[in-house]
């Protein structure tokens, strides 16, 4: 059962009047003085400043903190609703964190991109610093960050203790660095509240992430801002109403539309005048692709410092870190980060001993695997692309190195633009500077649950990697698809133990996994303390194979464990806590464990949580649904619903790019005065003109003689009429 955490905030502090955090009476003008600089290449890796605060000089020691990937992008939508990246915002060399010398519990989070901007936290008071506008010198404004928190408190936290998977127990410390790759979305109203300017809003989000990293430094955890999305003109989903419903709507939306660079967790930041809640999150689910997301509500009067604390608390809860029990938990700061009061307090805030233990326990389990992926980071300090560095950057079509070393016939090395005769320079759908034909395979299917992708005929890049929707049956209906793989228990056994291995017998699984020791279990509570599988969960515990060989299985990285059950040799593996392969010890999430049931975190649960709502019947029983819930049709059936059949169509989906290429009829252009070459008409084109001309001549001749005949007859008739009318005229006149 998921524990959905909804956090209520103090109405008196977020919903009512709050003192402005910059008070005129506390403002000071200071001129920071750089006294130390350590460079690596052309970038300062360490720097120290003297800063005067209230007539006292302090030394702030800073170390560069990288949290933007080298290909970071800020996205928004154009008037047609198509997502587009903004200009380069990937400058990531100028963000620092550190402390104030002589104050061991202090914290500093500073940006030096354009002057100093950020936060200085002493034990009981915090100061904001930012450049003084229109200053001739290096003058800055420094001010105390204050909160009217006399009445601030959480009215309740809906945490069901029974659903907190990880109990706090002692565990050895770890120096391993963990990473959270985060995608942040700023909705329309918050975008306006933060300044209504892309550069301003982006800088504030950078400040937030920098502050979060300063808080998480004690856990050796880095938040990477994978990408930023701004909803400037309109929101993609309604952001009003109940925050619980908003979270579920956001999760549903991001499954279909959030297809940017890889990320572990996505957050929607929403502005509300006087919210009752500060956010919503799924507890302990940060690495779950279906539930790795959250909502954070920004009130009208909250400070950037407080909003950073809210995001840290929400992320912490998503990693299984509960709120502190004031009677049991302690920290070195004035107030602990996972205390409800931390949102509204000034001064240094640190994680408690309870939070540190909970985090270490979480990262020692297989459900924290996504935090172990180290993203590619390198200093990006050029605001403009550099042509000739062998890297395609913003504003470039291609980059093949210097003019001397470039061997790309499609790319102009001097401008990093395509040559006039080229349509593309690189990519699986580019061949000799031309796009490959629409429908040509550019990415083969790698699994029964994977789908092939095709060139679309208008780009050198391959289509997005698509796969069969999670929950679809595979391997003769025995297993199900999960993230493009058929989660076969037998395949996992062979991947883990060897290609000749077979899955353990029912007796192996049932008798071993109902124990609570190293041979079989349903999870590790703490080193040496194992959790026995319940009566319905033993198929989801330790992964076990049957072994009938005489030689010993060898595994240099883990411990191989043998057990004799009913005359069968049953084998499992034990990896040390935090090992990169520790997830292989247990049956994978999504493995079938019963009718309409699958394994999930060592429990056999209903498969309904997968949201398998797009079935072959949705596709008229002539296809399967892909991960975007669009039909991928069988050959000869036509997307989007696979209802109609056409023998000339190859099937596929509206996403895969393999709709058959329909050649455009050749267009004949009438040459104008600028073209002087003579035109040679083919003989077969002259014949129709000759026939038409002959018919016209014959028609004209016929009409001519017909008219002549009519005139002769008319003349004769006129004479007869005159002769007949004369007596009548005289007769009338005689009267």
From Swiss-Prot:
Cytoplasmic face residues: 702-735
Primary localization: membrane
One GO BP: binding of sperm to zona pellucida
Transmembrane segments: 681-701
PTM section of the record: The signal and the metalloprotease domain are cleaved during the epididymal maturation of the spermatozoa.
PROSITE patterns the record matches: ADAM_MEPRO (PS50215), DISINTEGRIN_1 (PS00427), DISINTEGRIN_2 (PS50214), EGF_3 (PS50026)
Keywords in alphabetical order: Cell adhesion, Disulfide bond, EGF-like domain, Glycoprotein, Membrane, Phosphoprotein, Signal, Transmembrane, Transmembrane helix
Glycosylation sites: 55, 220, 288, 353, 456, 564
Domain notes from UniProt: A tripeptide motif (TDE) within disintegrin-like domain could be involved in the binding to egg integrin receptor and thus could mediate sperm/egg binding.
Protein name (Swiss-Prot/TrEMBL): Disintegrin and metalloproteinase domain-containing protein 2
